[in-house]
Amino acid sequence: MSHQLTFADSEFSSKRRQTRKEIFLSRMEQILPWQNMVEVIEPFYPKAGNGRRPYPLETMLRIHCMQHWYNLSDGAMEDALYEIASMRLFARLSLDSALPDRTTIMNFRHLLEQHQLARQLFKTINRWLAEAGVMMTQGTLVDATIIEAPSSTKNKEQQRDPEMHQTKKGNQWHFGMKAHIGVDAKSGLTHSLVTTAANEHDLNQLGNLLHGEEQFVSADAGYQGAPQREELAEVDVDWLIAERPGKVRTLKQHPRKNKTAINIEYMKASIRARVEHPFRIIKRQFGFVKARYKGLLKNDNQLAMLFTLANLFRADQMIRQWERSH
């Protein structure tokens, strides 16, 4: 497919002021290792045969990335390609040829789900970041967040998603799933991801969030009791787990007497604060707030892609911070 600009596209590209969307897409264009990502999907992507010629794999991958960055459904992504020139240019498409429709966009997503390729992309990108010296292994921060799913029964099956469950946090009930993550303490990059129903206890997945090379593990009070767990008995690390809020409140009643213990809690909090960065990126930057699909597998595929892109977004932030300080 030729990547030629139409008159409208060329007029757009010659205007002076860059929009925020253009600047963002330009940064992502440069940071994403496209060839590495294409190689993961290529063995599974349809080859050109006697039928309709498929769109270039990289074009479909670029569209898939934009869907996650802007939290767009398949239909909204199709509309955006027609309406927004910067997104068309990023996908290497132009208005003088056919643009992928929502079914084509959906089929690409189904291909990734079917072969669990988002998980492979997550591993590939993390290996690439580790080889580049961005991701370290000294410490792991662990955390989990509840992701709400539609709780209405007003659908075709007249029931809620059976793979999602309800759980109570504080005084509030939530229905949905949980994303458990292990984050590199130095860079704030996510190295492990496990998805479960929302009623899964955070501690049950802790072992699956460790890579085995860390010297310390940092977590909030929800992970109290980790060192005593049978499956974690062989894990030789320093456990930096926050005390329960009630105990911290008791310590603060006698600040002078408990000064050291209080300072240790502040130190633990400052270390684990970085675990919030990946969640903040996917929720605030990418606009992900609710499970879009039915079943854990489809949502796991979306979350694996979101955390892959969040790691690359974070790597870009780190590069720009370094450039500003030099």
From Swiss-Prot:
InterPro entries: Transpos_IS5 (IPR047959), Transposase_11 (IPR002559), Transposase_InsH_N (IPR008490). Keywords: DNA recombination, DNA-binding, Transposable element, Transposition. GO terms for molecular function: DNA binding; transposase activity. One of its GO terms (biological process) is DNA transposition. It comes from the Bacteria. Belongs to the transposase 11 family. This is Transposase InsH for insertion sequence element IS5U.
